[in-house]
Swiss-Prot record:
Listed InterPro entries: BT1/2/3/4/5, BTB/POZ_dom, SKP1/BTB/POZ_sf, TAZ_dom_sf, Znf_TAZ
Induction: Down-regulated by salicylic acid (SA), ethylene, hydrogen peroxide and cold. Up-regulated by NaCl.
Name used for this protein in its record: BTB/POZ and TAZ domain-containing protein 3
Transmembrane portions of the chain: none
Originating species: Arabidopsis thaliana
Length: 364
């Protein structure tokens, strides 16, 4: 056994440097070029800038043009490959016309097709033009880079509407989401910008869509706030019933069972509702007009609610628990369903706290 283990060759060392470099490079699309040797990038960039052996040219606005290599452009973009074939004249010469965007943006676009190189400041300046070009000519790597730049704080309330319309036309879901979130978050400021006013005149359907999104978001916030308020009420009821069981079973402060030693009014209780419930119980026990007293009615309701939740009314220490249990059977089905629904909501609110919440002690 020992001789066989000696013949096992040692494993090769882990490719730590290469692997870590690959991991870090996958975080941002723009850093993928780090996997390509610097010399290779410089060679392709030099080929673009010098135009040696160029067999076509790119025409921009104002009849400006610069040389390019049709094979490189065709390999980088299937759309450009088709356009070059369609532009071929009788002598076999080709050309590519890109109008409607600044010459500098076209130059950066063609340079990126060669070497994926760019100047960061120039990229930020012409990012919207390059996004359009990357979408129109189907260059996914450039499109990802533009999305990355836009998603890094480039968008503000002044340009968010313009960027949103452009992102919708270029099928950039991520940027559409970012813009929509910004509009919803600061609708008052965004709706007063010049971009909004222009969009309102040129694209009223988009304006209506954004307004509806803002209204829907406000409705969701109000609904969420309402549910949180309801949940808080249910939790307070649960805490009140916990304090009721605690007082009736163990005693607390200055009130409790006769066979239990009371802790005194200066004792700090772990049940938050105990102090308020202690005063309510004292009032309830000494009140002469329980039938008409609003405070006593709430105590009756709390006792009845406890009986709906209590699983063992026969041995329960809470006063009148068994009596309310029997009384519940005589109520109409409609009334019973109301109490049952209230109990379900309280239990659901309590369970939403989780087992480690400080608000749940588990007495009931």
């Amino acid at each position: 056994m020992s001789s066989s283990t000696k013949n096992i060759p040692k494993p090769p060392p882990l490719p730590c440097i290469t692997y870590q470099r690959f991991q870090s490079s996958t975080r941002k699309p723009s850093s993928l070029m780090r996997l390509v040797p610097k010399e290779a990038l410089e060679t392709w960039d030099k080929l673009f800038k010098e135009g040696s052996g160029a067999d076509t040219y790119v025409e921009t606005d104002n009849k400006s043009h610069f040389p390019a290599h049709s094979s490189v452009l065709a390999a980088a973009s299937p759309v450009i490959a088709t356009l070059l074939n369609q532009s071929r004249d009788k002598n076999g010469n080709t050309y590519l016309k890109i109008h409607g965007v600044p010459c500098e943006a076209v130059y950066m676009f063609i340079r990126f097709l060669y070497s994926s190189c760019y100047e960061e400041e120039e990229m930020k300046k012409f990012v919207l033009h390059l996004l359009v070009l990357s979408h129109c000519y189907s260059v996914p790597s450039l499109k990802r880079l533009c999305v990355e730049i836009l998603d890094q704080g480039w968008i503000n309330k002044e340009n968010v509407i313009d960027v949103l319309q452009l992102a919708r036309n270029c099928d950039v879901t991520r940027i559409c989401f970012v813009c929509l979130s910004m509009v919803i978050k600061d609708f008052k400021s965004v709706s007063s910008t010049e971009g909004w006013k222009v969009m309102k005149r040129s694209n009223p359907l988009l304006e209506q869509e954004l307004i509806e999104a803002v209204i829907e978001s406000d409705s969701r916030k109000q609904e969420r706030r309402r549910k949180l308020e309801e949940r808080e009420v249910y939790l307070q009821l649960y805490e009140a019933m916990e304090a009721l069981v605690h007082i009736c079973r163990e005693g607390c402060g200055t009130i409790g069972p006769r066979d239990k030693a009371l802790k005194g009014s200066h004792t700090v209780c772990k049940f938050p509702a105990c102090k308020g419930l202690e005063g309510a119980l004292r009032h309830f026990l000494g009140c002469k007009s329980r039938a008409s007293c609003s405070h006593c009615k709430r105590m009756w309701q709390l006792l009845q609610l406890h009986s709906c939740i209590c699983d063992d009314s026969n041995s329960c220490k809470v006063s009148l628990c068994w009596n309310f249990k029997e009384k519940m059977k005589k109520l109409s089905k409609k009334e019973q369903s109301k109490w049952r629904l209230l109990v379900e909501n309280i239990i659901r609110a309590r369970n939403s706290l989780g087992p480690f919440s400080s608000r749940s002690s588990g007495l009931i």
